[in-house]
From Swiss-Prot:
It comes from Chlamydia felis (strain Fe/C-56). Residues 1-76 form the Carrier domain. The gene is acpP. Signal peptide: none annotated. 4'-phosphopantetheine is transferred from CoA to a specific serine of apo-ACP by AcpS. This modification is essential for activity because fatty acids are bound in thioester linkage to the sulfhydryl of the prosthetic group. This is Acyl carrier protein. Keywords: Cytoplasm, Fatty acid biosynthesis, Fatty acid metabolism, Lipid biosynthesis, Lipid metabolism, Phosphopantetheine, Phosphoprotein.
Amino acid sequence: MSLEDDVKLIIVDQLGVDASEVNENSSFIEDLNADSLDLTELIMTLEEKFDFEISEQDAEKLRTVGDVITYIKTRQGE
């Protein structure tokens, strides 16, 4: 399974949205109706899955599904 698929599955599971609603341009707040608690739980799940910590400053910049995928790819390339 690709990184993109992994991230999308986590988002579908955490936010309880339909997979068809999740694409790289989906905004967590505007398109997927996530609130701040949802986003905090999502960040925690991503940290656990990919085994690194996401700083609060970085987390605030992750507004779309694509932002998360790009961030993880960058972190994995370190």
